[in-house]
UniProtKB/Swiss-Prot annotation:
Official protein name in the record: Probable ketose 3-epimerase
The keyword Ribonucleoprotein is assigned to this record: no
Free-text comment on the cofactor: Binds 1 Mn(2+) ion per subunit.
Active site: 152, 246
Organism, scientific name: Synechocystis sp. (strain ATCC 27184 / PCC 6803 / Kazusa)
Length: 287
């Protein structure tokens, strides 16, 4: 058994809604009541959010904040369109600035291109070079902060530029920035990795952040995944970051449709969050 907690447990705002807009105090009330250590704020509209208001909510309810975003439609780090490419880099730089203003030190997301964009071909060499060059420029901004920046590989149905841990490590090696790492999402990994636990061990200290859910996007622990062995792997890695429950509010039809949820995967979003947290904590503490 572990002697002291190294892992913190968070909940993603997709549990409630698609876009966090800054005034949803009920999110903080729920997360605190459910027993989470923190909240992962997800939005494309961070330019319109008051950082001081966000900080005040976190302080009022005693929960820490992490931040998640992705490139909006029309942007891309793999494009040959110079204006689009520059605008995409600028978007990520603004996200970094927003995190600084909020006192957030963990920024994560699927950044190479918008979620769901597929080119119809595997990642081309010129696109890979373009992506690496973009992250090198982002790293120039990143190293002036205390922020950890985690890039998420997506499954093949939602992205084509980064699908596996191996591809992610190749990107990190090319960029060579200690503040750049990987967000590893169990849903995507259960599709793309032949051995999820081996992939985590391969990522090792390059794993900066984790999204957890069952294989069907449901409650952690309600599936056949080897959760106990997985937590042992995290201990082997000496992982000390966040394990954040990410699933999607089925009642938010735009969000559910985007995640291809055609049926409920838990009795309720509250049950998914609470039962998932209870299971994760208990499994972590007994391994």
């Amino acid at each position: 058994m572990i002697s002291s907690p190294k892992i913190k447990f968070g909940v993603h705002t997709f549990i409630w809604k698609k876009e966090f807009l800054g005034n949803e105090e009920y999110v903080f009330q729920d997360a605190k009541r459910w027993g989470f250590d923190g909240i992962e704020i997800a939005t494309h509209y961070f330019d319109q959010i008051d950082p001081l208001q966000l900080k005040s909510y976190g302080e009022k309810y005693g929960v820490e904040l992490t931040f998640c975003t992705s490139l909006p439609r029309g942007l891309s780090l793999t494009t040959k369109d110079e204006d689009c490419w520059r605008e995409s880099i600028a978007y990520l730089e603004r996200a970094i600035k927003f995190c600084q203003q909020c006192g957030i030190i963990q920024l994560s997301g699927p950044f190479p291109h918008p979620v769901g964009y597929l080119s119809g071909e595997p990642l081309q060499k010129r696109e890979n070079v373009r992506m690496q060059e973009a992250f090198k420029l982002v790293a120039e901004t990143l190293i002036k902060t205390d922020l950890k920046f985690a890039v998420e590989p997506l499954n093949r149905f939602q992205g084509y530029a980064l699908n596996t841990v191996a591809q992610g490590l190749e990107l990190l090696d090319a960029v060579d920035c200690p503040q750049l790492g990987l967000l590893l999402d169990l849903f995507h990994m259960n599709i793309e990795e032949k051995d999820v636990i081996k992939a985590f061990l391969q990522a090792s200290n390059h794993c900066f952040h984790i999204h957890a859910c069952a294989k069907d996007r449901g409650t952690p622990g309600s599936d056949s995944f080897a959760w106990g062995h997985w937590f042992k792997a995290l201990q082997t890695m000496d992982y000390q970051g966040w394990v954040t429950i990410e699933s999607f509010n089925f009642e938010d039809k735009e969000l559910a449709n985007g995640a291809r949820l055609w049926r409920t995967v838990a009795p309720s979003n509250e049950a998914l969050a609470q039962d998932g947290l209870k299971f994760l904590r208990q499994t972590y503490q007994t391994n």
